[in-house]
């Protein structure tokens, strides 16, 4: 009984404790009277020393910007001129020639040479946010003692409808991307033979360029004087002729300055009163060497050229092609003796591969041509503990090319009624080493194959050429 009473006492104690706890949690909270705090004065931002110092620095910076904008060379005037150019040293060796059987031909071994090839110096600049200019002079191996005019033009932006207009001596875009490069960015030392034989180079004229679809569509129009103005002694005559030229390119794929590129284009050239023109050259591109099958000059009342171009570049690898047709109306010797209308065709295909990773050639959509090589690891000398060691390997490029050009042959030394044709085929290989975007070492090898027919006789001359070059641009 005693144990039972103790158990009841303990149970009663637990119940009392639980009841007390529940009463605490169920009790209504006590509401306290809020305290009123006295206002504390705070320093405003405009009165702080830090803000005053920042305002003074901003005012000084604004004053410097305004003073710089007022100086010549800002958007209110002309920029400071920039000087650029290039310098080429070439070596050319003619190996295994077989030209002796050709009319007016001869062995060309004596034309091997090594030395200065070409130099250019140019001044460029901009002004008033809508003008640009370029003045360029050329010094070349076979030119006269006087420098020749190259690019000399004034460009005007934001022209209604035409968008961008150039006036002056400039390239006639009667070819694809390779033609419009200028010699600085050629893959080979010269143009493929099919292009280097018949194109207009520079002429005095007016051109316009219109860009659409984020610059992926480019439309080019030009009107020029048909006569080449090459030196300061040129005197205009009364029969200058006119050149009308257009070129359109479309790049549905373009990223990273052309690292991924798919481009197609077409061009057309019409020339009235062509004047005296050299015949097709059987030589590697435009090298300044003897021409074994260039049989004089001819005249033509009208000249037309139409072509197609395409480029596909995927990183280090690129394939490029250009094909064209030419038509000469009333080919003659300038004295009435001629062979009527003549049509030529030609083209080339080129494959290029950079052997070094992450290197590729950039493409300029606005200008419609190739730009400099993007060299990820430039070759240079680095100071390591007082000793200069090579650093970086530069960019190495391997290229192959096949070109063909089928043309008529005309010369005052061959009867006008003669059935004369010539087909020139050329295969080439190139190994290029770019120390950086401005320095290039090149080795080129060409094999030239020509099938010629003069007055019923057939000729099959061939030749091999080795070329090396050091090219520096700045």
Segments from the language model and where they lie:
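Long amphipathic alpha-helical scaffold segments
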Residues: 57-79
